[in-house]
């Protein structure tokens, strides 16, 4: 799980601020199991390191994720 979280944060810090990714996008990028990715994303959100965005264009059951802006 820690390896997946590190990979997610590496990708998010390398892309422009505000770009959104879905769990399926993460599966394509990392090649990891979607359930492991979802657990890693949930942990990162609970740690306050990423933000979950409910997109108007996306499905309500498929949240999008982005790096949390520094305050």
What are these regions (language model features)?
Residues 17-29:
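Short acidic, hydrophobic short linear motifs in intrinsically disordered regions
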Residues 32-43:
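Short amphipathic alpha-helical interaction segments
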Residues 3-17:
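Positively charged, polyanion-binding regions of nucleic-acid-associated proteins
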Residues 1-5, 53-71:
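Short, cationic-aromatic polyanion-contact patches
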Residues 45-55:
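A short, conserved structural fragment
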């Amino acid at each position: 799980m820690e390896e997946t979280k590190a990979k997610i944060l590496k990708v998010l810090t390398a892309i422009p601020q505000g770009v959104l990714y879905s769990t399926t996008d993460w599966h394509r990028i990392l090649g990891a199991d979607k359930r492991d990715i979802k657990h890693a994303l949930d942990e990162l959100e609970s740690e306050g390191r990423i933000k979950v965005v409910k997109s108007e264009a996306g499905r309500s059951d498929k949240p999008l994720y982005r790096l949390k802006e520094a305050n």
